[in-house]
Amino acid sequence: LSPGVISIENDQPIINTQPIQVGAAIIGPTVKGPVEIPSICTSYSDYVSKYGNTFTSGSQIYSYFTSISAYNYFQAGGTTLLVSRVTSGSFTTATSTNLPNSVESGVISTETNNILSSLTGVTGSAATYVISSSATSGVGIGFTGSIILSDGTTVSSITTTSGGSGYGIGDTITINSGSLGYSGGTIGSNTIITLDASNIVNNNAFTLETLSEGEIMNSISNRSTDGSLPSGSIDNLRWEIQSPDINEGTFSLLIRRGNDDTESPIILETFNNLSLDPTSPNYIEKVIGNQVQTINTTESEFYVDLTGNYANQSQYVRVKSVATPTYEYLDNTGDPKTGFTGSIPIASTGSFEGATGTNIPGPSAGAGKYYETINNTNNTQGLVSSDYTTAITLLANKEEFRYSYITVPGLIKDFATHTSNISSLMANSQQRGDTLAIIDLEDYQSTLLEVTNEAKTINNSYVAAYWPWVQTLDPSTGQQVFVPASTLIPSVFAFNDAAAEVWFAPAGTARGGMPTVLRAERKLTKTNRDDLYKANVNPITTFNTTGITVFGQKTLKKKKSATDRINVRRLLIELKIQIGNLAENLVFEQNT
C-alpha cells in the first residue's frame, strides 16, 4: 500500500455499575442476624446462615413467616432477597471471650474449677463457703470466689467470681482453716492455692464481635470433656487460634459453629497468616473487616451510617479492637522485634458472650402468637407493630435500596395497631414509584365481606392484595401451618420472572401455581372470585385439575386503567428503572 493515514472509529461504550437490584424485599422477625440493617441473601442456605430458621417458645418449635417465605421464594427460582430483621426491645452483639497472647495479665481465671487442681490441704465441714482474699504481700486486688466442700476433705467445686489483679505464677493464696466451718471441735490445716500458668489469664490480643445480635449468640460455657460447649448451638459461634508463629508474627483464625466439638469441628470460616501489624497486607482488620452499620434516624429519611475503615469480609464476625498492634513486626534484619513477640495470640479456643435481646416473650407477657393465631392483641410472632416502623422507614430510601416488590408477612391491614405501618408501606411504594407492596388485608378466618370492605379503603396502583390464607408445610419443622398469602406470593412472582418476564401476569395455571400450598383456607366459588375481583383482591383459587392457583393480577387502584393490572404496573416500573439508569449518564453532558 502507498503511504497514508487510515482513520478507524473504535466505539467502546461506557458501562457503569448500577446499584444492586434485588427481586423481593421482606421485613419480619428472624432467629438471628443484624437488626434492621437490610442484607442480601442469594440462596436459602445463605439466608439460614445469616438469619437462622427455627426457634423454641413455650417448649414448641416454630418458624417465622420470614423463613417460610424465604424458603419458598428461592425454591421457585428467586435469586436475590433483601431481608430486614425486626425485633422487640434492645439487642446487642456478642464479643469474644479472652483471646490470649503470651503476656500474663495478673488476673485469676474465672472459669469454674480452673484452680481446683492447685488446692492442697483441704479440711473442713461439708458446705458452701464464700472466699474473700486480701493480699498480705505484693500489690494488686485480692480475688473472691466460692468453694463447695462435699465432705471434710473433698472439694466438689471452686469458682472465682472476681479474678483480682497482680497475681503471678507461684503465688500462693491461703484459706484460713477457721474459715471453713470445722465441726466437732477439730481444727484442720490451712488450705493452700499455689497458682500455675493455667490459673492466670493472659492479656487479650484482640476482640471479635458477632455481626448477628441477640442473646442467642452467647456460646460461653465451660467446655465438656469432648470439647463441646453446653451453650453452643447451630446459630452461635466459637473461635480458635491455630499456628501462631512468633518468627513471622502470624497466626490463623477459625470461626467454628457453636455446637461442634473437638473430634468433629465444624469450621465456617478460616483466615490464614493473619497479622497484628497494621502495615501488613494481612493485618487482621483488613482481612476480616471492622465496619459497624447503624441506622441514622435523626432526619426524615433514614439511612445506614457506616463507621470503620475496612469492609467486613467475614460473614459472621468483625474485629472490634486490636489491643496491641505490632507496627513493623520485623526489624531491618528480618527478625521479630523483642517487644512484639508476646503480643501474638497463642493457640487457644473460646466462645462469645455479652449479647442481649430476644423476641421470645417472657412468662409475664404470655405466649407469643404464631401462624394462624396472630391477632389484634398487639402480639404478632412475639412482636408489636411499632417494632416494624424503623425498618419500613429505612426501606423507603430509594437511593440506597432497590427491590421489585416488598412484603411484611404478619402485619394485617385491618388490625388497628398495624394500620399505620401498612399505610406507610403503601405510601412509600407509591412515592418510590419503583416497587410493588404486597399486603394482607385480614387475619385468618375472616369473611369475604370483611376482605372486600377493607380493600375498598385503598386506592393505590403500587399495592396488591391476595386472599385467602393458605396452608403449607413448614420446611424446617415439618408442621402443616397456615400463613397469610403475602408469605408465599413472592414465590409466585419469582417463578413468573424466571419462566417469563416481569411484564407477564403472575397468575393463572401457567405462572400462578402454588405447588407448596396444601390447601387454601377456603375453597372459593366463581361468585366468590367475582366479588373479590370487583374489589381488586386477587383470589387464590382451588382447581381440581391444577391445584392451588393465583387467579387474579389486579393492583388496588380503584379507577379502571392500565395500571390496575400488576403486569402493566411492573412493566412501567421496569421501564422507569432502565430509562432512569440510562438518563443518569446524560446528566451534565452536551444535549444540543
Task: Give the location of each predicted region.
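Short amphipathic beta-strand/extended segments with alternating polar/hydrophobic composition
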Residues: 95-105, 144-148, 192-194, 219-220, ...
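Extended Gly/Ser/Thr-rich low-complexity repeat segments
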Residues: 127, 167-178, 230, 237, ...
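Residues on the solvent-exposed faces and adjacent turns
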Residues: 177, 210, 410
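Charged, amphipathic alpha-helical segments
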Residues: 2, 7-10, 55, 96, ...
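Short small/polar-residue motifs
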Residues: 68, 139-148, 191-194, 201, ...
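Conserved, function-critical positions that sit in or immediately flank catalytic
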Residues: 106-199, 232
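Short linear motifs in intrinsically disordered
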Residues: 16-17, 71-72, 104-123, 165-166, ...
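Structured, hydrophobic secondary-structure cores that serve as assembly/anchoring elements
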Residues: 1-100, 125, 203, 244-262, ...
